[in-house]
Swiss-Prot record:
Gene Ontology biological process terms from the UniProt entry: negative regulation of DNA-templated transcription
Keywords annotated in UniProt: ATP-binding, DNA-binding, Metal-binding, Nucleotide-binding, Repressor, Transcription, Transcription regulation, Zinc, Zinc-finger
Cofactor dependency: Zn(2+)
PANTHER family for this protein: TRANSCRIPTIONAL REPRESSOR NRDR (PTHR30455:SF2)
Gene for this chain: nrdR
Its biological purpose: Negatively regulates transcription of bacterial ribonucleotide reductase nrd genes and operons by binding to NrdR-boxes.
InterPro entries reported for this sequence: ATP-cone_dom, NrdR-like_N, RNR_NrdR-like
Family: Belongs to the NrdR family.
UniProt-recorded name of the protein: Transcriptional repressor NrdR
Amino acid sequence: MNCPFCSHNDSKVIDSRPTDEGQAIRRRRECISCSKRFTTYEKIDEIPLIVVKKNGNREPYNRNKILNGVIRSCEKRPVSMKDIENLVDGIEKQIHNTMEREITTELIGNLVIDKIKDLDGVAYVRFASVYREFKDINTFMDEVKKILSEKPSL
């Protein structure tokens, strides 16, 4: 590590501790040449996640796209923002657990469908109608009937 004061390339570590909830390491160093102290941070270099769209295009993963879709589906429903954040956190955890560098919009959509179904039935139907591209009222009604047969309390 080059010293920011004299540019000497040798230093010794005085102190080392985890920061950012264990996502980084903060190191206090002392230059061997000029004896000045400085701080460095060590972080894992995360591999960017790429989303493969239905048309084959690729784009960087964007949490806000999932979040906005779920928020729209839960509009005017008794669902708190905390519940929505937790739902999206759970989806992200599942995505990262796949250990894949590329993930399809189909997989993301299915994860949202599975999670939102347990959160709110109306939000589920709203999301499913857009995600599954319901063509007519019969498709919509079939999905509602399926939900009602699974959860008669709706």
